[in-house]
A protein has these predicted regions:
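Peripheral interaction segments used for macromolecular assembly
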Residues: 1-184
Length: 184
């Protein structure tokens, strides 16, 4: 089932033993468009902390957006506060063996709002990403076409993204505007 990443932000996290925190962001690999971490704000009653949950720890996402995880509260509490220093997507990604990775970890929050360029001109901006809970991929981006097709949102395969200019906040598609017609 596909889930709106935008709608998941702010969703409750239900641990094995109780409701615990909420989703702040989702981090993904910008080469494979695969979810790497769900950023959880633990909220109250303990001091506010941000921890990372791997997709393997997610048991399910209910239709209302609540994420049930395969961890108990104590297991989540033991996770380090990864965002205390700076956002993870600005750090070099660490591999499971603890070695420095290649830095392709990106924040879904940063992607949303980026302008979108088709091969033949401006298309609009990224309004949302869609998450497939079967394989934890982000197969589609949702584009608000803005002035080009007022009031329309279109779904485009993430595989059609040719390049992302993170500094200029532009997503370049390997498609022409006319090839993008499927409304969401």
């Amino acid at each position: 089932m596909l889930h709106s990443v935008k709608a998941l932000r702010g969703s409750a996290i239900v641990a094995q033993d109780e409701r615990f925190g909420f989703v702040v962001d989702l981090y993904f690999d910008d080469r494979t468009w695969t979810l790497r971490y769900v950023v959880l704000d633990t909220g109250r009653p303990m001091p506010q902390r941000s921890v990372l949950l791997e997709p393997a720890s997610i048991a399910s996402i209910d239709p209302g957006g609540t994420l049930s995880v395969r961890l108990a509260r104590k297991q989540i509490e033991k996770k380090p506060d990864w965002l205390a220093e700076r956002p993870v997507y600005l750090q070099h990604d660490m591999t499971p063996t603890g070695h420095r990775g290649d830095g392709h970890l990106r924040s879904s929050e940063i992607v949303m709002g980026c302008s979108v360029q088709a091969l033949d001109g401006s298309l609009g901006h990224v309004a949302d990403l869609l998450l497939d809970e079967r394989d934890w991929t982000l197969p589609c981006i949702v584009i608000d076409t803005g002035h080009w097709l007022p009031g329309r949102r279109v779904r485009v395969a993430a595989a059609s993204v040719g390049e992302i200019d993170w500094i200029g906040r532009k997503v370049h598609l390997a498609l022409e505007r006319e090839a993008i017609l499927a409304p969401v």
